[in-house]
Swiss-Prot record:
Membership in a protein family: Belongs to the ABC transporter superfamily. Energy-coupling factor EcfA family.
Organism per entry: Aster yellows witches'-broom phytoplasma (strain AYWB)
Subcellular location: Cell membrane
Protein name: Energy-coupling factor transporter ATP-binding protein EcfA
GO MF, one example: ATP binding
Subunit structure: Forms a stable energy-coupling factor (ECF) transporter complex composed of 2 membrane-embedded substrate-binding proteins (S component), 2 ATP-binding proteins (A component) and 2 transmembrane proteins (T component).
Known EC number: 7.-.-.-
ABC transporter domain boundaries: 2-231
Topology relative to the membrane: Peripheral membrane protein
Stored PANTHER family: ENERGY-COUPLING FACTOR TRANSPORTER ATP-BINDING PROTEIN ECFA1, HEAVY METAL TRANSPORTER
Gene name of this polypeptide: ecfA
Function of the molecule: ATP-binding (A) component of a common energy-coupling factor (ECF) ABC-transporter complex. Unlike classic ABC transporters this ECF transporter provides the energy necessary to transport a number of different substrates.
Primary localization class, coarse: membrane
Amino acid sequence: MISIQNLTFYYGCNPILKDINLTIQNNSWVSIVGHNGSGKSTLAKILLGLLAFNKGQIVIDNIVLNEKNLPILRPKIGIVFQNPDYQFTGLTVREDIAFGLENYNVCREEIIAKVLKYAKMVKIDDLLDKNVNQLSGGQKQRVTIASILAMEPEIIIFDEATSFLDPQGALEVQKIIQTIKNKILITITHDLDFASKSDEIIVLYQGKLITQRPPKNLLQDPLFLQQYKLTPPLSLQLYYEILKDSTTKKIKNNQMLENLKDILWQYNLKK
């Protein structure tokens, strides 16, 4: 479990995060959304121990996040960044997935087994002997995910992990993320369509935590989304347009509208 209490972070004299309080349960998937500059990536860097916060407390798996405990906490957390090109230096897919394990003195037989297991999980087992530099952006990001999974962290952060990918590559990576179980998953994203698949959505706005609630509750509140500059999934945009039109024409069949909303919501979840 991750517990954050009264977290405040300043960059120079500017407050980037202001008195953040939230709890993320074990084996849950949360999405953190918000416009640019809301503090999403800053929060991720703090959780990784890359930035020291000014006030508050973070407890991860009953361990307080501080400089003394960083060597204990860092192996518990993995991160997938925006750009899949940042770490590749001419290795094969097999070598890249094995790289971190070799640094942790894992025995050769276990490395071979883990490489194959996680390559299959992200559907790149047919690419194991291919040079990573020859892969598409989506394939590279899947290699990154396999490398992180092979380290078996308890928490994985996806920091805009699909934003550099074409639509097909982004969809492939999103589907893989949805298959990961028994970990805390934190997806930082602008894509509310993708965020709607998670257990909870956390909204940050100008460094403040606005809400933490289930996607269906949040995404069916058009006034809230408009207030905090969030774009709803396309299927729900259609519902809002129909709702607006029905209001204009004074259509009062509320049950029909509710049924339509549920149909569009279920369609959104199945995409």
